């Protein structure tokens, strides 16, 4: 026993082997005894596979001899067994976080340098790597085999470690790929890595971490030092877990960070009938986790629907299956459930299209035959892309708080993303010989357009089978090929579900670009035709970039932008009016929307129908985004809307605040703090957002675009009946009418000689005007009124007063909206009286239009928007000169010829009134209040701090 004791003493004083290396050895010794009692070295070679090379026997007097002596001592073996369990627990809890702590896979050559500051990894390199490298050098062929490389019979002894190390940021290795790699590689060191990657996926990251470190010499340790080292490792692992987050030890998948799942919803077969007529109106929902990621269109009266719709979903991991649910659409009632199915994403082969047939089941009635759904799916790993540069673009559906999400990632090289590849301009001309859906032999038709997530709904043409819409709108093209545009025609029915007239499709990939195509489309599943004009044009200047990539700060790019919108290039693309750059820098003091007292804010920037988003800053009330958005300006009178929401993964996003900024009120290059307002833009809410905005535009193009119809928003809130809104519009209309009534009273008082001096002056003025009146004096009088008000304003005698009456009405309306939101949850949709509501809404809207028209005329002369007032002065000067030099009969003759020949010259021209189009750009009193900037008040909090849902 003396030589054996001496060997053991040498082991304790050795410099190269570490304490954990001896634990690995004793694990092998224990397994060998448990299986056959032949010892660790004796039993090991008998169970090795053919692909596993046998290590050379160690020279005498080495570490293995010493460990054999230690293993023969029973008292010491019990201590080693305890330490073995502790070591299993340490690696079970720490290994997944070691791998997941880096956003990218660690390169073997740079892993040690990248994580030099990590306490846990430094300790593991110091205490694990020297033994592996030292023993490999000493033996020349293999050295010590860790548990990953033991025999198959010994695998159950470390099942806890194997299961706990299953979470990794790398893609899960497939069996055929692993076998091919094992045949190509050679050497025991490679075999060690192969065994770990197949049975213990999480250890591959550990090997990459440990490999590049040089084997430093270890100082001599005392007998108590291994226990201290063991406690240090446990403490470091627990700290690492608390920093990164708890790992799920039961998850068997490894993720690269992001996957793209491309789904093509083909068709359904033999679906269940849910309507009384023996048919259904099916549509499909896709969910991952508890979040809806896609909803298909509705196929009416069909049990074998054909959708052929595509969806692209970005997912963080493959743990959650794809949940497919089919419903029958019921207007005004709860949709009927038609079955569901799950698709296990872990069974899909990467980068390969897979046709999937799913059998629909009802959990409550598992024996019922509910039909099948056919899909095509492609799963693609997205490696090397960082989440912190992910830009989300959500298109909210009308009256929906859910988001249809597209991920738009910034380029790693330029960190700049152009969002769409082109624009398709659509003009809906007319319908011909449509199907009669009403009892009177007519219809009230309207048309719905859908291109991907974009939707547009035309106006309703009452009581006609040959409607004339003459509407123009634009869609964005996100695919190089163009995609399929779905078109459906409907008949509007008050109080019940609208009737389906027919459908058709347009394959945009078959149309040539930069050319207008006239299409006469036959309506399938119905009667009649639709006439369209479709034009595909190049991409507009719309992109997202980091703050470091700034077009306006690059002198060369700035000169190109200024050149493009110079006054000399007036007739080059009249729709391209200007360039807008918005820097979303940060926000401060936002409202806390979560129960933790924090929020997950992201910012939405909207200009007409262009809608872009920043990334989400989690758990922060003072987020910094530092993003730059660029837009193409089509109308200089547009309003930039910036809205802050709180992201909520389980339900709709929460509203935090909003600002509305007219483009003509922007001061270029100035960083300003905008106080966030409530949803109706009538009062302040908590928080301030810092923006820096630059606008460059061509004034001549902007003036010409003022005289054509405004661009309609695709997604607008449905009008609902509101007592306060109805009263507000009535009061606004009454105020405009009262002005005319007071003017009539004033004239009548002159006729009645209530004030003789005033009546005498009015009589003399009347005689002079009538005797010398010429037609050109009408615009001249308006011109004098504008000029008079202008000099009053610049002289400091501003007669414009803040409309406190409108502000008070808006505050009352906001309180009623809050009550309606609460009451609406209690009332059922079926209890509403549709016909009465539509009549009241129509009256409400007419009052709003009349009141807005009067207020816009007043605000034009009050110089509320100086650009428009100057434009009115120029137009009135031109009209005055025309009326002065040209006889009235010639003017009327030219006007009549133009009206009679307009349809002959341009048969598909959209009817418009230039004067009304001009007035539509002037804000009403309500809009003036909404666009007012609020001064930040740092000393007092806003009066109302409440959490509003996205409406």
From Swiss-Prot:
Biased composition (Basic and acidic residues): 174-184
A cellular component term, taken from the record's GO annotations: synaptic vesicle membrane
Residue ranges annotated for the C2 domain, each copy included: 240-358, 404-521, 555-676
Any single Pfam family the record assigns to this protein: C2
GO biological process: negative regulation of cell migration; negative regulation of endocytosis; negative regulation of response to oxidative stress
Main location: membrane
Biased composition regions of type Gly residues, renumbered to the chain: 31-43
Subcellular location(s) of the protein: Cytoplasmic vesicle, Secretory vesicle, Synaptic vesicle membrane; Recycling endosome; Endoplasmic reticulum membrane
Cofactor or coenzyme needed: Ca(2+)
Chain positions recorded as Ca(2+) 3 binding sites: 438, 444, 491, 493
Bilayer disposition of the protein: Multi-pass membrane protein
Domain of life from the UniProt record: Eukaryota
Binding-site residues, Ca(2+) 5: 594, 600, 646, 648
Entry keyword annotation includes Transmembrane: yes
Binding site for Ca(2+) 6: 594, 646, 648, 654
Keywords: Calcium, Cytoplasmic vesicle, Endoplasmic reticulum, Endosome, Membrane, Metal-binding, Repeat, Synapse, Transmembrane, Transmembrane helix
InterPro entries: C2_dom, C2_domain_sf, MCTP_C
Bias (Low complexity): 147-168, 219-228
PANTHER family: C2 DOMAIN-CONTAINING PROTEIN (PTHR45911), DYSFERLIN-RELATED (PTHR45911:SF3)
Protein name in the entry: Multiple C2 and transmembrane domain-containing protein 1
UniProt organism field: Mus musculus (Mouse)
